[in-house]
Amino acid sequence: MKHVLCAFIVVALFALTACDNKSTPTAHAPTSQNFVDVASTTTKPTTQTANAQAIDCQAITNTLTTIDASSQIDDFDKVDKLLNHCLPTVDNATQIKWATQYQLAYQRFLSFWQGDTFLFDDVEFNQLNQVMYDIHYHEKYDESDIAKLPPKAQHLIKQVKQGKLKIANHCEGEFDFNNDYQAFAKLFTPHLPKDQAVLIERLASDNQEPLWCDAGFSVSLDELIQRALFWQDYQKTYPQSVFINDAKHLSLFYEFLLFFGSENTYWLNDDKTEFITYINENDETFTDEASFVKLAKHDSELGKKAGAYLEFIATPKDERDEKYPINPANLAKRDLNNTGQIEDWERATLQLMTALGSTRADVPNCINAPICLPASDEP
């Protein structure tokens, strides 16, 4: 996608790893592709045993690893049929490998890049973005507008209208295509152990819509709290899960978002001495303090940190240097040699990190997909 999908955490506290998008090179001409919508065929039903014997399950990996931006949705339809027969017959490591390969294949398929070449010119991309806007917001649009799009774009829009793909709204008029994460979960989770099924079902639910919206959050504070609590509880419920490290990463990530916010979503003033007051549509004033007070009463590690958070806010600024000395490790990550180089707002953030025992949390490869993905496209 030509735009950058993710704007990140306050004061550049995160080392962002989630987005691989590139800027659109206007010098490149769009690549010509042929996209033909293949009608689904009806196969004669046979028993699972017979099909398992007849089907080469290795074809799953071979097909998934060759799918790219020039492929068609029909390739996934074929893989789905293979998976339905083969998933019950293989070990868990292979099941996870296929699930990962499947999502990576979808990401390549939905990409607007073919190698180093962007598939649309600026005019075509803007036309596509407008159609995606109209469909997402249920606005009226002319079918002729779709007919004017390049074949690749027409193919993807058709799959959206048929319910096979979703349009993701990144705000500020920027959109993306996603596969249906609930369909992903329905395909894989019946064959997985409970801990793995629970994780995938949760990610499918949380991640279908983007977390980020114009350098802020698309979800409420209370939703962030629920996500942070979920991943904390997951670690206690499934300590031996093969996904335990992913759960730990997600727990730290959402905890950090909860207490530190983002560039355009935050709960405290710069000095972190009081909650920001908002005015709702009825001209009523409110703050987010009640959510943290409620969380502080929760019998959990997150609840204890919420209590420490409220205590920090109540601590006068002139007492914080002694009570909450800045962790040198956090200072070093900011490439600062001493506290004298720190702005007041940044000092408050670093002191709050001390109060909560927090460090910076990288964005996990688990917030844009129904499964945590490897850092490279090589599962």
What are these language model-derived features?
Residues 2-9:
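Sec-dependent signal peptide recognition
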Residues 15-18:
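C-terminal motif of bacterial Sec signal peptides marking the signal peptidase cleavage site
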Residues 20-22:
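Bacterial signal peptide processing site
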Residues 31-173:
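N-terminal Sec/ER secretory leader and immediately downstream segment
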Residues 58, 275-379:
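Hydrophilic extracytoplasmic domains
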Residues 89-93, 115, 119, 186-194, ...:
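Short solvent-exposed coil/turn linkers within tandem alpha-helical repeat scaffolds
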Residues 138, 142-170, 179-225, 257-298, ...:
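Short coil/linker segments at helix-helix boundaries
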